[in-house]
Amino acid sequence: MIEGSFMLNSTRRQFIQTGMAGGITLATAAQPVWSANANNEVNVGFIGCGGRGNILMSAFSKVSGVTIGGVCDPDAERLEQAKERFPKAQAWTDLRDLIEDKSIDAVVIATCNHWHCLAAIWAMEAGKDVYVEKPLSHSQWEGEQTVAAAEKYKRICQLGTQQRSDPMQAEIKTFLHKEKGLGDIVSVQVNRVGVRSSIGKRSTPLLIPNDMDYDLWLGPAIDEPIFRDKLQYDWHWDWNTGSGEMGNWGIHILDDVRNVVFRDAVKVPTRIQSIGGRVVWDDAGNTPNVQMVAMDTGSVPVQLQLANIAAEPGGKKSPKHRGPGSGYIVQCSGGHYEGRRGSGVAFDRNGKEIRSFKGDSGNGSHQQNFIDAVRKRDQNILNADIVVGNDSTAWCNLANSAFRASREYDPNLVTHGLPSMNEQAERLGKILSPHGLGLQSKGIQAS
């Protein structure tokens, strides 16, 4: 039992009301500190046993000295599957029970986005170290509270942006900055171009399975009817529980850009504009499936294009784009570099390949890095410390905020906006055109 804990004495509604009132005062709690035992073992508990949770269970189980000591999920079917994989692990439906258990040294959080911060704060309050999946926060306020909790309770806290642990990243930074292999950096283009499908639009609310503890699944989210076809995974495309493609894939690429191009010197953009919408599909989602973003960083400008619709109606191919579908292009005075998860290629001015980079995407090594920090009690060796993770997540939250604050498309917003907005609008127009849509079509918004 954690005396005085906000965790133990709050309901979903109370958490929402407290947050809206201006902030949560982090309670002082007993802080058991992990210490080396004879076998240097770390007992890890998992909150969230779905797709990503299962991948992380596999990764952590391969780290020497790590025991999968607990699994937790409000979905009974997923929990049972996790128990079958790790029969020696304790199993809970309520994350608070896992967090309270004194045998658990560290917690891995792979829930829906809206649970990330609250679960992390509760775990750190209980003296656990935390590995939390990306994006860190569902809102920037939550992220700041999580950073504060890590500092207050002296916890090791790592964000699941595993590409930070890919050795390739250091090689690329040396090539671009120290060696000046392509000259001066001029601009950056970020791409997330990948076809997805409609999530459906029911005429009646989705029935929640009887074996799901829906109140625990909702947590701090608003209890409202769901009209999509599936409860799981497609929560990404609902602002109530997800962060859209920007928080799903965009966080990985933008984190790479912050790391490789800016070397974390730029915390957040100074100005940001967005144009896009949710078009083509008449479904229950409310996050954009096409979005162009311009970011003023105070130095190197960043453009981002996001497209989940196909190149043409009924097609399966993505719209045409320069560079990787999920990656980024660093335009330089002497050529350009194209980076993606696990690999990268540098080209000269004439488009000739002059150097390639090969990595491991950080899978496995990122989890090892977290455990190393837990054992050494040294957050400085983390490759994706919670402060860095909060800053990278902020880029996604700001891009989403720019979209949500936007209004019906007005050419003046583009004409008098950031320099790259005209190019971004033209790019969006080309993606929309095969579907019989344009910038003036219903659903297209600009900020």
Could you describe each region identified by the protein language model?
Residues 2-23:
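N-terminal secretory signal peptides and thylakoid transit peptides that target proteins
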Residues 107-108:
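N-terminal Rossmann-like NAD(P) cofactor-binding module of classical short-chain dehydrogenase/reductase
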Residues 18-23, 55, 228, 245-261, ...:
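C-terminal helical cap and adjacent loop that interface with cofactors, partners, or active-site loops
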Residues 112, 117-165:
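Beta-strand-loop-alpha-helix segment that lines the small-molecule cofactor/substrate pocket
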Residues 215-301, 307-315, 387-391:
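Rossmann-like dinucleotide-binding domain that binds NAD(P)(H)
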Residues 149-155, 171-186, 199, 205-208:
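Basic phosphate/pyrophosphate-binding loop/patch that engages nucleotide-derived ligands
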